[in-house]
Amino acid sequence: MPTADRPVATLTPPTDSTGVALGPMCRFGPADAPRIFEHLLALDADDRLLRFSHGIRNEGIAAYVATLDFTRDHVHGLCTAQGDIVALAHVGVRDGEVDFGLSVTSTYRQRGLGRALFSHVIALARLHDAVRVVCHSVSPAVLHMAAASGFRRPGGSHTAPLTLDLRAESHAGDDAQPCPAPSAVSLAAA
């Protein structure tokens, strides 16, 4: 099982619109809260509705970020070489069940970042020996990825959240890295 000093599973980093690789999938901590806030604040009203399943104002986003529990939950994502968060997943692990929320900056959509986050969430759930992943999203893109990944509605109810039941099995390593602060990121590394 992952620990605070052992990062989580990652995928090959996708590229941005210029073909430059984004940083590796990384886990954010309390020091990254301002960057998380900026990422979520940049979402327009429609994107906020899709991300949070309800309308949310700037004050609500500030309250949400202030209540993130980085020791209990997992907040992972992808950053540009400048350290800007362009894709974010907040993953809660409770009693053998994982739920999550995803967001991708509008200019970085249609590049596989959402799919990378989605796959990362499922890998993280397996790493934590979860028996089920729950998807509460109303986003058509997330619902499409969920259906393609085998998520189903329990009992066929159209109002129930989508769930993916996981088989108990051992899974590969946990190799996400902490995200560097924007000032520590070298533009030459891109």
Where are these regions (language model features)?
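Short acidic N-proximal helix/loop "leader" segments that mark the beginning
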Residues: 1-19
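A short beta-loop-alpha structural element at the N-terminal edge
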Residues: 23-36
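Acetyl-CoA-dependent GNAT
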Residues: 42, 49-99
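Conserved acetyl-CoA-binding loop-helix of GNAT-fold acetyltransferases
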Residues: 104, 110-125, 148
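Conserved GNAT acetyl-CoA-binding A-motif
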Residues: 125-138
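Conserved catalytic-core motifs of GNAT/GCN5-like acyltransferases
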Residues: 136, 152-167
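Short, charged/polar, Gly/Pro-enriched secondary-structure boundary elements
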Residues: 168-175
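Short, cationic low-complexity segments
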Residues: 175-190
